Amino acid sequence: MNKKLLALTLSGALAASMLAGCGGSSNGGDTSTSTDTKADTTEASGAEGSVYYLNFKPEQDQQWQDLAKAYTEETGVPVTVVTAASGNYETTLMSEMGKSGAPTLFQVNGPVGLANWKDYCYDLAGSDIYGQLTSDNYALKEDDTVYGIAYVIESYGLIVNKTLLEKAGYTIDDIQSFADLKKVAEDITARSSELGFAAFTSAGMDGSSDWRFKTHLANLPIYFEYQTDGISSTDAIKGTYLDNYRDMWDLYINNSTCDPKELSAKTGDDSRNEFLAGDAVFFQNGSWEYANLTGDGGYTDDDLAMIPIYFGVGDEANQGLCTGTENYWCV
């Protein structure tokens, strides 16, 4: 779980490196769906260029404003940070790219997002930040052209309340496969009145929650099909492992804190709050949830673990967490 803290630290370090490599105009302009704060500037002798960063994460706006101010104070290079409203990044980016002072630093979410902006991207192959990567897996590239650099690596799986799991008579060592997970979850459901908790938090289909299943869970059948077929891209999947996807979804909704009929209205906050209240053992989410689950009145590190989303495919005992990024910086 402490990987979240490491990711944030790396994010800050990468930010300083990336800002140092940017030039051009910073006149971003106002939009109705963004926060635009220009850092106070102190021009240093010999300072050239400026930076306009279109930020994706509203919850990190203040940190970026602080970093921009500190960078300007140190270098004299003016930095503008505009933060798009939640869920409006792509539309804001389209609007800003049409202006004379387009962003010098922006974000794409991977190959799909890159398709729209490839022609705008500076090749980072010879940059200092690319040279600092420990693996090309952290770069968004085609052939020898580097279009983007991952700036945070995160993991997701099943977050486990170990205390509740042990109260049900199990430990995480008892769960090494989908069959094991199914056995434990269904046993907890059968004894839920006695135990006082369910197996899984609600798998809400509200927009604040459904991405966990429409994107994160849906990655698994695609990943395993790619692995089986030895490919890295395809125009259409064959659906080899869609039955596994359905089986996992059925396990979630039939062993949950709520009736499946209620899922359309359940939110991400509902799922998190159920886990915090000790209403369920398992919570599908990722390392970014660490701060929400710990701290004052929350869990300790000893209370929590994260296990893979076992899918009934391959060598499950050696399966790891789903790890990667959908956050790439482009210049």
Language model features with spans:
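Short, solvent-exposed loop/beta-turn-alpha elements that line the ligand-binding surface or hinge
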Residues: D123-N137, F200, G204-G207, I222-D247, ...
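Hinge/lid segment of periplasmic solute-binding proteins
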Residues: N109-V160, R212, H216-A218, D303-I307
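C-terminal motif of bacterial Sec signal peptides marking the signal peptidase cleavage site
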Residues: S17-G21
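Extracytoplasmic/periplasmic solute-binding protein
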Residues: Y147-Y151, Y156, K182-T234, A280
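Glycine-centered hinge/linker elements that transmit conformational signals in sensory
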Residues: A185-E186, I231-A265
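Short helix-initiation/N-cap motifs at beta->coil->alpha
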Residues: T83-T92, F178-D180, E262-A277
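Extracytoplasmic/periplasmic substrate-recognition and gating elements
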Residues: E74, P78, E166-A168, T257, ...
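Conserved N-terminal structural module of periplasmic/extracytoplasmic solute-binding proteins
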Residues: K4-L8, C22-G113, G126, S264, ...
